[in-house]
Amino acid sequence: MKQKVIFVLLNDYSDWEGAFLSTALHVGVVPGSDVKYEVYTAAPTLNEVRSIGGLRTLPDYSFENIPRDYAALVLIGGNSWDSPEAEFVSPLVQEALSKGKIIGAICNASSFLCSHGFLNEVKHTGNGLDQLKQWGGESYTNEAGFIEKQAVSDKNIVTANGVGYLEFTREMLLLLQANSPEVIAGWYDFFKNGYFK
């Protein structure tokens, strides 16, 4: 049976940040490979959310009716992670972590995790240490855990900066064991370097 991966979207979400991951999960890391996951979306309500690029998405779930039988929550970045509606995501993350589920956060969603203390026990990255310190304030006590990389995976949390979407996808695919490490490495090489180097 396929497991659910739920992409958490707020208005003004960055549509490019989750595109590679959702596709690799939905159709398989490579054509014809096993598909272990189903992709779903969640938003504050069941009303559509609109991306920075103007794409409209009708969510599968509101934050109130997210099922509990999922494998991972993927927090897609954008311009609303410091808004009041973002605050409803914090208990979802807390519950997911308490149940050993995987959390992915990219761009400002990483800063959101920082501002709620979720990065204090793990190695992590984001849109720069200065931004994490600004968003985190006194809640951020793990400056030593910050790593200057496009994406970082530690324990059950994957973080990335806003242009680290390929590395974010790679680390999420590895953590989810969506395919073998060799196949995932080949996927990453293809999308990073293209047909011609």
Predicted region positions:
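Lipid deacylating catalytic domains
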Residues: E48
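Short gly/ser/thr-rich secondary-structure transition/capping motifs
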Residues: I52-D60
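Active-site-adjacent pocket-lining segments in enzyme domains
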Residues: K2-V8, Y13-S14, F20, V27-T45, ...
